[in-house]
UniProtKB/Swiss-Prot annotation:
Similarity comment: Belongs to the WD repeat CIA1 family.
Spans of repeat WD: 31-70, 90-129, 163-202, 208-247, 253-292, 318-365, 380-453
Annotated protein name in UniProt: Probable cytosolic iron-sulfur protein assembly protein 1
Stored Pfam families: WD40 (PF00400)
UniProt keyword terms in alphabetical order: Repeat, WD repeat
InterPro entries: CIAO1/Cia1 (IPR028608), G-protein_beta_WD-40_rep (IPR020472), WD40/YVTN_repeat-like_dom_sf (IPR015943), WD40_repeat_CS (IPR019775), WD40_repeat_dom_sf (IPR036322), WD40_rpt (IPR001680)
Gene name linked to the record: CIA1
Keyword Repeat annotated: yes
Length: 455
């Protein structure tokens, strides 16, 4: 069990700048008839999925639209969102969470009816089309029952995963897409193997938590699974090829329910959000670092030297009520050395906070520097913020076809900047939030080029 060293962690609370910027609203996406619970950006297509207590999943497509200055010069492209499709999932109760596979071809839905729904794009099922994102805002959209949708469904349910004995709270694909994890109020974490033709086989059922399991999340580049629970703990799991999946460490220190967890893009840190009003940052030390600091590595087995996760920061005093969600995204605009990205947090106080994270100037220090750089009060009026989620850095497939940037622009042009697509830098500036008011909102930092060009 990994026990937090509070003296070290408390010393690293984030600094407050003299003037904290607010967030700039890019889009407000309404339509859910009940609270919006969760969001997921498709990693391959320009689509943002949201789920709700109304049992529907709404797919919002986005494109990048050019704006022109008063002098007639073309300026930065900003995102424009439109409702692409409403999926009536058929779940009997709330859809609590949604997740995309890394190739963007599978959507999973976790429901309070204890099941996980598996959805595939119809054109991919029949093989009639290469995976592409249709972002044409003037496409075949009609109004029906107060909400627009495409004429024909684009996504179809191809399977239902059963086994949980109570509400299913979370679902997540591994970075390879070969494994799916789900968790439930029944205190269990299930691990499923993703097979061809939407076949899923249960590989393991883990009963490590003593209470309701709130969320599961995969490491961005390793087969490491994390889960967080009503029992205030975070557990990490790996697969022993000669045996089974097992919990190799438990992270303790939170004083109440852990609602959300998010790995850093580099994979060496983990952020967690809790009912104790804090966000905590944990750092992974490899075997050599453990030896240098006199710590014993955990998770050792054949071919694996082990590691240890320790608490290094407590972000306290930034939320007045439960912190329900945390998301760690890429920061492509930072010029600071040791850039580790940005953390966003949202909670029951209706506030969204954004923190910049950088490595310490002191090479001997294990604590990153954390600075509050933006804050949005009443992000969803008086409603709770249930989820915050940074957009992906770019729409690239792992080991597969790349979604061309032309699909994201209104002019079909490729925007080159320093050998990269300019929009790749800016995509990660988008932050989506979901609230108890049923709405989904898309924000950006006031310093972002989007804020200057959006209407």
């Amino acid at each position: 069990m990994t026990t937090m060293t509070t003296a070290a962690a408390k010393a690293a609370e984030p600094t407050r700048t003299t003037a904290i910027a607010s967030l700039h609203l890019l889009a407000e996406l309404e339509g859910h008839s009940s609270r919006a619970w969760h969001l997921a950006w498709n990693p391959r297509m320009p689509i943002l999925a949201s789920c709700s207590g109304d049992k529907d999943v709404r797919l919002h497509a986005y494109s990048f639209v050019s704006t022109t200055s008063a002098q007639g010069a073309s300026t930065c492209k900003h995102p424009s969102f439109n409702l692409r499709e409403v999926i009536p999932t058929g779940h009997q109760r709330t859809v609590r969470q949604v997740a995309w596979s890394p190739d963007g071809k599978i959507l999973a839905t976790a429901s309070f009816d204890s099941t996980v729904g598996i959805w595939e794009r119809i054109q991919d099922i029949d093989g009639s089309s290469e995976l592409q994102g249709n972002t044409d805002a003037s496409g075949p959209v009609v109004l029906s029952n107060g909400g627009a949708h495409v004429d024909e469904p684009e996504w179809d349910c191809v399977g239902t995963l059963e086994g949980h004995e109570s509400e299913c709270k979370s679902v997540a694909f591994s970075y390879t897409g070969g494994v799916l994890a789900s968790c439930s109020r029944d205190k269990s974490v299930w691990i499923w193997e993703v097979q061809p033709d939407a076949e899923f086989e249960c590989l393991s059922v883990l009963m490590e938590h003593s209470q309701d399991v709130k969320v599961v999340a995969w490491h961005p580049n390793d087969e490491v699974l994390a889960s967080a629970s009503y029992d205030d703990a975070i557990k990490l799991y790996i697969d022993d090829p000669s045996d089974d999946w097992f919990c190799y460490t438990t992270l303790t220190g939170h004083e109440s329910t852990v609602w959300s967890i998010s790995f850093s893009p580099c994979g060496n840190y983990l952020a967690s959000a809790s009912d104790d009003l804090t966000v905590r940052i944990w750092r992974r030390l490899d075997a050599d670092q453990c030896e240098a600091h006199g710590l014993r590595p955990e998770g050792k087995m054949a071919g694996r030297r082990g590691e240890k996760w320790i608490a290094v920061n407590i972000l306290n005093g930034y939320h007045d009520r439960t912190v329900y969600s945390v998301s760690w995204g890429v920061d492509k605009t930072s010029t600071r050395p040791g850039n580790l990205g940005r953390i966003a947090s949202g909670g029951g106080d209706g506030r969204i906070c954004v923190y910049e994270v950088t490595a310490s100037d002191d090479e001997k220090s294990l604590q990153p520097k954390v600075e509050l750089i933006a804050k949005m009060e009443r992000a969803h009026a008086s409603a709770d913020v249930n989820c915050v989620s940074w957009a992906p850095e770019s729409l690239n497939a792992r080991g597969g076809t790349t979604a061309k940037i032309e699909q994201l622009t209104d002019e079909g042009e490729t925007l080159n900047k320093g050998g990269q697509h300019a929009s790749h830098e800016l995509m990660s500036d988008m932050l989506a939030s979901a609230g108890d008011d049923g709405s989904v909102k898309v924000w950006t930092l006031a310093s972002s080029a989007y804020a200057a060009t959006s209407k």
